[in-house]
Amino acid sequence: MSDYQVLLYYKYTTIDDPETFAKEHLAACKEMELKGRILVATEGINGTVSGTVEATNKYMDYMANDARFADMVFKIDAADAHAFKKMHVRPRAEIVSLSLEEDVNPLEVTGTYLEPSEFREALLDEDTVILDARNDYEFDIGHFRGAVRPDIQNFRELPGWIEDNREQLADKKIVTYCTGGIRCEKFSGWLKTAGFDDVSQLHGGIATYGKNEETKGELWDGQMYVFDERIAVPINQVNPTIVGKDYFDGTPCERYINCANPYCNKQILASVENEKKYLRSCSHDCRVHPANLYTKNLSKEEFTERLQAINESSPEMVQ
């Protein structure tokens, strides 16, 4: 039995004073020795925390004693250690943002909820568009079979992508999904206000689908990206596959790294060997960037040799 747990949760509910709430909530979390990242806004709370089984159970009881969160659903993962290094509780304007001029309130308008078994049926329906509401790098390490991959790097870019592809989506039955459900609550609501009539969402997100006893994560390929030190977790209990591809050579890969150029910081899939070979950088420009955090530890001679090994030159060698 694992000694730790990771809790993923959210709740759209009114929090009148997010700043005061955040300060008091941070103190409570630290007292329970939790670590994680929590966002609070007048529209609700969105969090992931890790801690011992005892501490996380205590936290769930603590939240249940607040009427605003009494029915909040926690997605629980067993863990061997903390999934975060620190504890942060931050007040925000929104707990998830689509950068809309007029925000959508999921308590007033949202897509129809599909339970995991209903969602699996939708996956098998050729007349249904399954739309991934996550970022491109999340999709690349794992997604539902046949799902559409929006070319976005941030959730707030999604409405623009929809408008650019409105013709292909018009009059279609749309079912959307995300990690735990919070993004889809707002996104599906926006779709309805934007003129799409038949809009549904996976209730509880991928995390719930993967733990469902009936679906067991079937028809999910790869792993699910998570925003903590685990990076990705398994979902498909039936016939797991690897869909991630190494950024450098296209071989199967589920290992994410960040480009060592802090001004880029792009997330890419790369093996340990290719991380070393390509100096943990996504491009030549990033490899030779003066702020590169990987190459700054190399001598000038080694840096030059490593570049030459991949048929590249350092800036001073270019005439």
Curated annotation (Swiss-Prot):
Keywords: Oxidoreductase, tRNA processing. Signal peptide: none annotated. PROSITE patterns: RHODANESE_3. SMART domains: RHOD. Its EC number is 1.14.-.-. GO terms for biological process: tRNA modification. It is an enzyme of class 1 (oxidoreductase). Residues 124-218 form the Rhodanese domain. This is tRNA uridine(34) hydroxylase. It catalyses: uridine(34) in tRNA + AH2 + O2 = 5-hydroxyuridine(34) in tRNA + A + H2O. Gene3D superfamilies: 3.30.70.100, Rhodanese-like domain. SUPFAM superfamilies: Rhodanese/Cell cycle control phosphatase. The active site is at C178 (cysteine persulfide intermediate).
